[in-house]
Amino acid sequence: MPPFRPFPSPSLSIGTDICHIPRVLRLVNNQKLFPRFLNRIFTQPERAAFQTRFRNLLKQETASDDAGRKEQAFVRRGIAAHLAGRWAAKEAVIKACTWRRLVLSDVRILKREQSSGVYGVVLDQVKAARQTEDAFDWTEEGTDAVEQDIGVDRSGQIVKVSISHDGDYATAVCLAAEEPAEGDVGGEAAARGMF
């Protein structure tokens, strides 16, 4: 048997995950479980971004006519698809980063500026990301307080992430360094064009 060439970049690791959107939709439709779910999967800056993007859609009154109910169901399905994609992305990052035991609050999925894509950040030092259900506040005052923390400087390792949706499923793939190289913390990887 001829010798096989090694993989050209042995320092890369890949992770993937799939999430069933109707499962997340059941949580979105449950007023008691939904805030717990958001606090479990998102860091504070991610919750603030979610709140800014979806607050008005989730605060709408229950529609009284059939057309209104169908529109609300469509909107909630879109929110569930977004959350399922973020869940799958975080799980993919956790699977790709075998060099460290990660939990959901160790990972941020962020939107690229000037693009529709996303990328992941594996946080180096984790501040308590979980908060009580009351921390997720739909009021304007709650939004302002949370939005101020978006700019909080936190170091971490950037990883490549791709999210895709098809029918009832959201899937994500992550490509990450097996172990962060010295100097790949705090934006140096981005400066070298690694993402």
Task: Tell what function each PLM region has.
Residues 1-195:
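Core catalytic alpha/beta fold that binds nucleotide/phospho-ligands
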